[in-house]
Amino acid sequence: MKIYVVATIAWILLQFSAWTTTDAVTSITLDLVNPTAGQYSSFVDKIRNNVKDPNLKYGGTDIAVIGPPSKDKFLRINFQSSRGTVSLGLKRDNLYVVAYLAMDNTNVNRAYYFKSEITSAELTALFPEATTANQKALEYTEDYQSIEKNAQITQGDKSRKELGLGIDLLLTFMEAVNKKARVVKNEARFLLIAIQMTAEVARFRYIQNLVTKNFPNKFDSDNKVIQFEVSWRKISTAIYGDAKNGVFNKDYDFGFGKVRQVKDLQMGLLMYLGKPKSSNEANSTAYATTVL
């Protein structure tokens, strides 16, 4: 009997150890019921502060830098409205989207994910509300071009720019997937807006300032917004390798005019590219324009 009891206790302790070593996923919530510009800015700051390494600084600037990859792989973003919550999953080491969670028209929680970015087990940890049976791999990929194609945008250049940005727009597209039967077009449009209103505003204060300036109204996006969004790696690499005391060693053009002062880019968060370079290394590093 004693042996049985000891074995049972040991098994329980082993299970408890396994449970407690499972990394808790950090959640950050944006309340979309009468939000203010200040509340939205605080929400964006929380994203930056959660993923940055306070000890990392690139190019002699004070711009936040994402920390190196760690065991805490994902960040959960919750959008709350008067009708419920829709959640977005982001990778902590680059803020790329991996999944979203929403109730369907029968009030069942369903998790939809990009299979190249997250496993079923990781998805369960990220969105425990959805059972494995209610997980579905998306039929398209996580890049903007693929999502835009499925969003079926017919205006202008048929890109996400044509949808605009803004808190009111985020709420509109959130409600299109909240407690509704799945419609791929609505889903893709929600993802396009949600990604930009979370990851992109965290990366670029320029975009954040447009949102708060027009808050809470929808506003037309512009080419500069799109150029920023496709240039995060290029900008981060230039600051990392070719800036000293916040000044580039030469003029750079990322698609919206030449810049020499890093501050003119209004950056909010840089990509992790390793340990900061010394001043001598930065001065001797020529930025490769072919970097994607």
Curated annotation (Swiss-Prot):
Reactions this protein catalyses: Endohydrolysis of the N-glycosidic bond at one specific adenosine on the 28S rRNA
Entry EC no(s): 3.2.2.22
Classification via InterPro entries: Ribosome-inact_prot_sf (IPR036041), Ribosome_inactivat_1/2 (IPR017989), Ribosome_inactivat_prot (IPR001574), Ribosome_inactivat_prot_CS (IPR017988), Ribosome_inactivat_prot_sub1 (IPR016138), Ribosome_inactivat_prot_sub2 (IPR016139)
Signal peptide: 1-24
Residues at the active site: E200
Keyword Amino-acid biosynthesis: no
Single GO molecular function: toxin activity
Biological processes, Gene Ontology terms: defense response; negative regulation of translation
UniProt keyword terms in alphabetical order: Hydrolase, Plant defense, Protein synthesis inhibitor, Signal, Toxin
Cited function: Ribosome-inactivating protein of type 1, inhibits protein synthesis in animal cells. Useful as immunotoxin for pharmacological applications.
Family the UniProt entry places it in: Belongs to the ribosome-inactivating protein family. Type 1 RIP subfamily.
Protein name per Swiss-Prot or TrEMBL: Ribosome-inactivating protein saporin-2
